[in-house]
Amino acid sequence: MIKIEVPATTTNFGSGFDTFGLALSLTNTFSVDFSDKYEVQIEGYSSGIPKDQKNLFIKVYKKTCQSIGKKPKPLKLIQENRVPPARGLGSSATAIVGGIEAALALHKVELPLKEKLKIAFEFEKHPDNIIPAFVGGFTVCATSESGVIFKKLPFPEDIKIVFVIPDFEVSTSEARRVLPKKVELKEAVFNVQRSALFVSALLTKDYKLLREAVRDKLHQPYREKLVPGLSEAILVSYKEGALATFLSGAGPTICSLTTENEEKIGEAIREVITKFSGYDAQVMVLKARNEGVKVYS
């Protein structure tokens, strides 16, 4: 069987809405081979994930086969889900990237990244999850008339990334619906300033700037109704020494950057989220992953 390992991703970093993405040390793994019929075996997180041809990985695999001029042959798929779905950690992106790489590996076809991205964007319109899942590391993405432009940048190795993952889901579509169609110029300027500051702080390792750099007025204030206790959790994280705290992707997961006290920060956030939402939450401490998707044959 061919094994495909795809990293989870976190995006936005507060001010970098639909722009910043980071590959993480947590992965989903997809093992595939040709078969007489489609067989899907799910391990790990499995609730709500189809075990037939409606499975996102299978749909992307079939589309990729068509794109490279190959007839989609049935697959046996073993899908090991370690990335919690619908939590703002790029679980869908892992399936999309995995499905593309599976079709290419099984048919021994190579495609440039630009062509892979064209297929991926048919399933996921926003590049901030997809691109770091392909290339790894910290990425800055921009869309243009000619396609997506991105730059991969180094992410500091001494920063630990604390995730507090509530036991409830927020779909991307739901998180998009609560956003306004228009924003005031001063709010757009607020985010432009801080997103530039964030990149500068990372590259120079001037971590004291990160707290201000992740402040946001474009999406988090509107998504707070979907994540009860978000503002309170951010405040308590700073009391425990966090460098920066924000929603991971569309949420409900909360992400905190730190160089120390990671367990205390995670537990403090977890207690606040549990108090305000009524749901428990899981704490994970991860690192940035410089590698993107890996294919083992």
UniProtKB/Swiss-Prot annotation:
It comes from the Bacteria. InterPro entries: GHMP_kinase_C_dom (IPR013750), GHMP_kinase_C_sf (IPR036554), GHMP_kinase_N_dom (IPR006204), GHMP_knse_ATP-bd_CS (IPR006203), Homoserine_kinase (IPR000870), Ribosomal_Su5_D2-typ_SF (IPR020568), Ribsml_uS5_D2-typ_fold_subgr (IPR014721). Pfam families: GHMP_kinases_C, GHMP_kinases_N. Pathway: Amino-acid biosynthesis; L-threonine biosynthesis; L-threonine from L-aspartate: step 4/5. Its main location: cytoplasm. Keywords: Amino-acid biosynthesis, ATP-binding, Cytoplasm, Kinase, Nucleotide-binding, Threonine biosynthesis, Transferase. This is Homoserine kinase. It comes from Aquifex aeolicus (strain VF5).
